[in-house]
């Protein structure tokens, strides 16, 4: 399943990020890609050795960790270190699949269950640059407002179309979920959303408490901690 997570960063935060990224040192994006991805990747990434990068990636981690909808949809166990990329002048990233595991500075290794892209450019400021994701439900083309994030299964083939005008800047990361199975995670998310909707409409009652009990027992049964 694919999820749109709005408002991860405020417009003020996005403007500040963009101003700081204008001063960043950018390197060939293939430095973080395996052999298969390097054949189809043509973009730039912020140098991960810079002080600016360290500060910005911490801000992204804090923002997603504090976003209730992100947590409900991803049920994250481990987040990768966020990276930042830039596309311009017809740069693109052809169809590829993300690696199943990635190294992690604290945990050694993590499984990539979900991929996330946090858009940092106004969609009207560039042409092209759509994230195209192929999954079991068909093909999805994604171009979100700056500050919004998209979550999708890391097992999906995906690409970024050529940017023919302007500049597309984004942050991206991977998530190991407490729930490995996409279908089970999607069921828990739908159950959680409906519980929250019922609570806002009717307040606390025995039926909602029963549904909460069901949610947490399923999470207990399926989670890998």
Swiss-Prot record:
GO biological process, one term: intracellular iron ion homeostasis
A molecular function GO annotation: iron ion binding
Cofactor note: Binds 1 Fe(2+) ion per subunit.
Enzyme Commission no: 1.14.11.-
Record keywords, A-Z: Dioxygenase, Iron, Metal-binding, Oxidoreductase, Vitamin C
Alphabetized Pfam families for the sequence: 2OG-FeII_Oxy_3, PKHD_C
Residues reported in the UniProt entry to bind Fe cation: 96, 98, 158
Cofactor list: Fe(2+); L-ascorbate
Record-listed 2-oxoglutarate binding positions: 168
Start and end residues of each Fe2OG dioxygenase domain: 78-177
Domain of life, source organism: Bacteria
HAMAP family assigned to the protein according to its UniProt record, in alphabetical order: Hydroxyl_YbiX (MF_00657)
Name by which UniProt lists this protein: PKHD-type hydroxylase YbiX
Gene name per UniProt: ybiX
């Amino acid at each position: 399943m694919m999820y749109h997570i709005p408002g991860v960063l405020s417009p003020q935060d996005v403007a500040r990020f963009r101003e700081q990224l204008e001063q960043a040192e950018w390197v060939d994006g293939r430095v973080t890609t395996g052999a298969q991805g390097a054949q189809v990747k043509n973009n730039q990434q912020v140098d991960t050795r810079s002080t600016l990068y360290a500060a910005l990636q911490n801000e992204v981690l804090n923002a997603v960790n504090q976003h209730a909808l992100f947590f409900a949809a991803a049920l994250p166990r481990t987040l990768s270190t966020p990276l930042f990329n830039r596309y311009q002048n017809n740069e693109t990233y052809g169809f590829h699949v993300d690696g199943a595991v990635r190294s992690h500075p604290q945990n050694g290794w993590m499984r990539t269950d979900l991929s996330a892209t946090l858009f940092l450019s106004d969609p009207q400021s560039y042409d092209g640059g759509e994230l195209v994701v192929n999954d079991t439900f068909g093909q999805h083309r994604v171009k979100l407002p700056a500050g919004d994030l998209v979550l999708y299964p890391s097992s999906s083939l995906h690409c970024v179309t050529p940017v023919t005008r302007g500049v597309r800047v984004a942050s991206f990361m991977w998530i190991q979920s407490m729930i490995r199975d996409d279908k089970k995670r999607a069921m828990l998310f739908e159950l959680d959303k409906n519980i929250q909707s019922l609570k806002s409409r009717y307040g606390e009652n025995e039926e909602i408490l029963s549904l909460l009990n069901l949610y947490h027992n399923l999470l207990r049964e399926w989670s890998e901690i």
